[in-house]
A protein has these predicted regions:
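Core AdoMet radical
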Residues: 44-61, 65-87, 94-154, 160-170
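Canonical Radical SAM [4Fe-4S] cluster-binding loop centered on the CxxxCxxC motif
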Residues: 17-58
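An N-cap/entry alpha-helix motif that binds or orients negatively charged groups
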Residues: 1-22
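Short, intrinsically disordered, charge-balanced linker/junction segments flanking boundaries
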Residues: 175-178
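Generic alpha-helical structural signal
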Residues: 3-10, 60, 89, 151
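Solvent-exposed, flexible loop/coil residues
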Residues: 25, 31-33, 141-145, 173
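Short, solvent-exposed polar/charged micro-motifs at secondary-structure junctions
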Residues: 3-4, 31-35, 115-116
Length: 178
């Protein structure tokens, strides 16, 4: 049964996506974060983390190297901050203007207006993990936030027209098999 499933999955993959292997290049442009998620090294309460934020020239330089290596998608990632929507839009626009690649954002939950601004600037995809479907575990992992808020953010991203990447953390303490 496994071999038949694998063969069928390969047929569907070839029909839907073709033979090209998409290569994504991740640029972590900042490790600043306003949240204090219990599992994350970027959490705001981590006193040993030296914070940084790349400027636009550094991001473009990293993107240039990534594209030269054959990257199809640039993933711009940071912790969650809400003080720079215009800056992110400007960087997305600069990358889309300069390079023939897709731009994916991974910058946490944001206001709907920011999602729209970045979409207009040229971002086409957004990564926003929900980590668990258990509301009480989500609240324990993300102090001050709820699973309903995360689901709402995912729905707002969908309405804004993004392709969305999401998912779980497998093996997080407190997780149950169901």
């Amino acid at each position: 049964p496994y071999e038949a499933l694998r063969e069928r999955a390969d047929e569907v993959r070839a029909r839907e996506k073709g033979e090209h292997v998409f290569v994504r290049g991740l640029i972590e442009f900042s490790n600043r974060c306003e949240r204090n998620c219990r599992y994350c090294g970027l959490r705001s309460a981590n006193p040993s983390l030296k914070r940084y934020r790349l400027d636009e020239a550094q991001i473009v330089e990293a993107a240039e190297r990534a594209v030269a290596f054959g990257v199809d998608t640039l993933v711009l990632q940071s912790g969650e901050v809400h003080d720079e929507p215009q800056r992110i839009a400007h960087v997305v626009d600069a990358l889309r203007t300069r390079f023939p690649v897709a731009v994916t954002l991974s910058v946490g939950e944001q206001p709907t207006a920011s999602y729209a601004l970045w979409k207009e600037a040229g971002a086409s995809r957004f990564l926003l993990k929900h980590e668990t479907a258990d509301a009480s575990l989500y609240a324990a992992l993300h102090p001050g936030y709820t699973l309903a808020q995360r689901v709402d953010a995912l729905q707002r991203l969908r309405r804004a027209g993004y392709e969305i990447g999401s998912g779980f953390i497998v093996g997080v303490p407190g997780q149950r098999p169901e």
